[in-house]
């Protein structure tokens, strides 16, 4: 594809500070020094060898292809077998600070190594899988999982494929068309379509930035990187010392967190799991009432996984509650998020022990026809959303309209509500070290600290 010419490179380089430029160039110079003999360029084999412990081989190949496509000399019509420091610098700056057009030029070459102007959906899908897998790899390698235990979660491989397909479907729906899976994989993707996609779906650029900054340890201490890491993956609390396996996989956590309000993206804490607390509607209510915003996830007896985000604390009341930040989602067999349509305000509902109104927990739709519903009998629920839920435009989320519940789990998101800290600081502090620090800063010391055993949670 032979992307940008040297005239635009200087404009691009103006987006970085001199010290940032020096850090990027230093990385490349260090690679060159490690080769035998004085060299100012790097070939594919050595490039992959140098990154072997930092990134998976499949993505280092794509990075090399992207760097190689950068034309720093407008007079040159041939592509060198080795990459230069200037190419590396331009590549890095374009992907981190470039416009959607500049990013798309590089990413198209990373997707299709034969420099085709038109790509197929399956090529984009494989690129996305490689990028997502690389992000998970570097987070694991550098101990940046923030308390998430991959052994206690759904398989990341399936989650990676699901997220890649979800992002691909957004590429294909930019022009308003919707395709089934095989149609998505076989359909053509133009460079202009990729550019629009990158502009409208910032999550792809987020993955690329994290892969480069964390994987290569370049500019990883800058403020924009810290913001990326907060958006990408929340801190997990409440998962230690438990034997349950979460209904979530890491790609699903990343995707759902991306749709949450920014102020609650930094932390998730486990409130309830039917595997731990039992299959009881009373137990569910007891663990989620007045706990702040939370994600409720259900697995039905057919293996479908889905749920909803409640933007406000759950309260038992006969009226609908919540606001337009609420949404429904599916995780398996399809990863997707369904946001507010504006049709009605039936965001969330929780009621019990009433004779004239439905007793249970629901989101979207209307009484007896919820987008998703857990009955107060707990073992059953429904998703009556044909053709779609009026509140969230979601399809039927469960395998059958009326389903049997296999598992339920609930995660609170954001900081612990202040009223809980004031009401029962002891129990909150045992699971939330940040909350403990806040109380200590306020002068509320813990007299019993030396009298109880230190748990694994305390030492993390």
Curated annotation (Swiss-Prot):
GO annotation (BP), single: TOR signaling
Residue ranges annotated for the TLDc domain, each copy included: 246-414
Cross-referenced SMART domains: TLDc
Stated name of the protein: MTOR-associated protein MEAK7
Function: Activates an alternative mTOR signaling to regulate cell proliferation and migration.
Listed Pfam families: TLD (PF07534)
Subcellular location field: Membrane; Cytoplasm; Lysosome
Alphabetic keyword roster: Cytoplasm, Lysosome, Membrane
């Amino acid at each position: 594809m032979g992307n940008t010419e040297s005239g635009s490179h200087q404009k691009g380089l103006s987006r970085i500070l001199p010290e940032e430029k020096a850090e990027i160039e230093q990385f490349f110079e260090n690679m060159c020094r490690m080769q035998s003999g004085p060299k100012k360029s790097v070939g594919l084999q050595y490039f992959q060898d140098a990154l072997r412990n930092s990134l998976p081989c499949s993505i280092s190949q794509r990075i090399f292809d992207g760097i190689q496509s950068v034309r720093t000399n407008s007079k040159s019509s041939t592509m060198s077998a080795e990459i230069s420091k200037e190419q590396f610098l331009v590549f890095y700056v374009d992907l981190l600070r470039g416009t959607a057009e500049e990013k798309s030029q590089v990413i198209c070459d990373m997707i299709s190594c034969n420099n085709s102007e038109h790509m197929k959906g399956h090529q984009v899908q494989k690129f996305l899988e490689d990028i997502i897998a690389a992000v998970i790899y570097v987070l694991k390698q550098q101990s940046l999982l923030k308390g998430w235990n991959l052994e206690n979660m759904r398989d990341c491989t399936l989650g990676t494929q699901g997220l890649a397909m979800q992002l691909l479907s957004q590429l294909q729906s930019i022009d308003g068309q919707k395709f089934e899976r095989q149609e998505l994989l076989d359909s053509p993707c133009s460079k202009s379509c990729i550019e629009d996609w990158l502009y409208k779906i910032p999550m792809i650029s987020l993955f690329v930035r994290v892969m480069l900054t964390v994987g290569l340890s370049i500019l990883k201490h800058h403020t924009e990187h810290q913001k990326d890491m907060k958006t990408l993956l929340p801190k997990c609390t409440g998962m230690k010392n438990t034997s349950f396996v979460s209904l979530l996989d890491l790609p699903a956590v990343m995707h759902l967190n991306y749709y949450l309000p920014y102020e609650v993206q930094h932390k998730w804490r486990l409130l309830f799991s039917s595997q731990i607390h039992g299959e009881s509607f009373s137990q569910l209510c007891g663990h989620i009432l007045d706990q702040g915003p939370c994600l409720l996830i259900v697995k039905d007896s057919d293996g479908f996984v889905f749920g909803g985000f409640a933007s406000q604390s759950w309260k038992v009341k006969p009226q609908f509650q919540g606001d337009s930040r609420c949404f429904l989602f599916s995780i398996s067999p399809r990863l997707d998020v369904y946001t507010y349509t504006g049709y009605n305000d039936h965001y969330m509902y929780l009621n019990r022990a009433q004779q004239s109104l439905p007793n249970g927990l629901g989101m979207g739709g209307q009484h007896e026809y919820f987008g998703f519903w857990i009955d107060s009998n707990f073992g059953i629920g429904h998703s009556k959303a044909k053709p779609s839920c009026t509140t969230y435009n979601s399809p039927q989320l469960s395998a059958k309209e009326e389903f049997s519940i296999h598992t339920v789990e609930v995660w609170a998101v954001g900081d612990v509500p202040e009223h809980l800290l004031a009401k029962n600081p002891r129990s909150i502090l045992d699971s939330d070290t940040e909350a403990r620090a806040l109380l200590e800063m306020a002068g509320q010391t813990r007299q019993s600290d030396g009298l109880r055993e230190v748990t694994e949670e305390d030492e993390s």
